[in-house]
Amino acid sequence: MEPLIRNIKDFPAGAPARLISADDNPALVTLAYSVIEPGGTSSHHIHEWEHEVYIIEGSGTLVADGKEYPVKAGDAMFIPPMVDHVTRNDGGDGNIRRIEINPISAASGNARPGGSEPGAGTPPVIRNHADLNAETGHTMLGGRDGCPNYLMLYNGAMQPGAVSHPETGGHNHEWDHTVFVLEGTGTLVVSGTEYTVTAGDAIRVPPVEHHQWKNETDAPMLRVTFNDIKSEGHG
């Protein structure tokens, strides 16, 4: 089965981009890209499912159940279920560019307006990629943070000439990979077929397909990856 590859440039500039939607039949998550202009906000709402958000650029304030949390580029945010939340662009750093990941169960809808009911009061988890260390490994958000369905990995810089899993020519597993390319260009090999991927691409690698990443350019490639929570500890 071929991977799904869709870029933010495939959508009108500045408009929300549903890069991986329920119509694509993902097994795990949907992925959307959005821009919050200075002085603007995200949607203000509350719902039964969790959000994970990664801020690509900009800074502002996450308001969760009335409490304010500063957020900035490189931050991963886990917003637990039933938390009233909105993100303001009040950081003075231009547009906020971000991706938002939801479990497939969210496709049924039923988000309600913010302020319409009490929130659960569960605090969000906010972690910057600069805070990763030997203990956390590449895991930005995972089971230790209360994530119920999927985890977020920050793959770091894949340097020119680097190849993933060189000893086996790649790997495969029973869960979906959902990947967003933050910077650079590389090659994704799926079941022997090569696909060029570049900054702004959202990629879904179907379960069980043998796959490998390569950087055959002269600049680093950066990615964030979303996997089923059951993959935790499997690399």
Predicted features and spans:
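Short histidine-centered beta-strand/loop micro-motifs
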Residues: I20-D23, T41-H47, R88-D90, G142-G143, ...
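Ligand-binding loop in jelly-roll beta-barrel domains
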Residues: N25-A27, P81-S108, P207-G233
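A short, N-terminal "cap"/entry segment at the start of jelly-roll beta-barrel domains
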Residues: M1-L28, A106-Y154, Q159, G235
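Conserved short histidine dyad/triad with adjacent acidic residue
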Residues: A13-A17, A32-H47, Y154-H173, P207
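Structural motif
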Residues: S59-T61, E68, D84, T178, ...
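Short acidic-glycine-tyrosine-enriched beta hairpin
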Residues: G66-P81, G192-P207
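Short, conserved beta-strand element in jelly-roll/cupin
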Residues: V35-I36, I46-L62, N155-Q159, N172-L188
